[in-house]
Design a protein with these regions (language model features):
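Long, charge-patterned amphipathic alpha-helical coiled-coil/hairpin "stalk" segments used as oligomerization
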Residues: 110-143
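Compositionally biased, low-complexity repeat tracts
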Residues: 44-47, 120, 171
């Protein structure tokens, strides 16, 4: 699986992720994987995804599609509601054009998008989960198989660390150290918050 984290501090946000890809017992390290960065970018947004390796290629394809480029499909990640609406708009596209299997649990109240992701941008740090629920975080969060270790590490250093990048990198390092499906090196991206959000 993975360790993907976001952190916010001192007017900046950071998203970071480990670099291993695994298929059951088989692991593909960054040494062998030419595309090991688990974070993709779209406009001013960085998105880290866990789960199926296909998710990243699918979203790269969606973001590069003519309909998105020409704004016929609007991708807006500036708030909880706009992220929800963007994923709600994308859901039928994922089903029809990318053959998403939306079936998850029989008792789920909605079809699943099957994607768990973290987003970092000038508007803050957000999490998107499989039923398109969106959470905005005030300090930090993590997803993936190393998330529990990452959250604990970020909690332990948040008050003393000076930067969002330091917090995020320590989170990924903890996930990679203690979770067998996460591994270094990491990738990270820092974004300055808009003035109205940074306060």
């Amino acid at each position: 699986m993975s360790t993907v984290v976001v952190a916010k501090k001192a007017g900046k946000v950071c998203i970071a992720a480990d670099s291993i890809t695994s298929f059951g017992d088989l692991k593909l390290s960054s040494y062998y994987d030419a595309a090991h960065d688990k974070i993709l970018s779209h406009d001013e947004n960085y998105i880290g995804i866990v789960g199926s390796a296909a998710h990243q290629l699918v979203l790269e394809s969606v973001f590069a599609s003519k309909k998105v480029i020409e704004k016929k499909i609007d991708i807006d990640f500036s708030s909880r509601l706009s992220i929800f609406e963007s994923f709600r708009t994308l859901h039928p596209v994922l089903k029809e054009k990318y053959f998403l299997n939306a079936k998850d649990e029989d008792d789920d109240p909605y079809e699943s998008t099957q994607i768990d992701a973290l987003i970092a941008n000038p508007f803050g740090i957000f999490g998107v989960h499989s039923l398109r629920e969106v959470i905005e975080y005030n300090k930090f969060w993590a997803i993936g198989s190393g998330a529990e270790y990452a959250i604990g590490a970020m909690f332990a250093v948040y008050d003393t660390a000076e930067t969002a990048e330091e917090i995020a990198q320590l989170g990924v390092a903890a996930g990679a150290e203690f979770n067998n499906a996460s591994s270094m090196p990491l990738s990270s991206y820092v974004v300055e918050l808009q003035q109205s959000v940074a306060k």
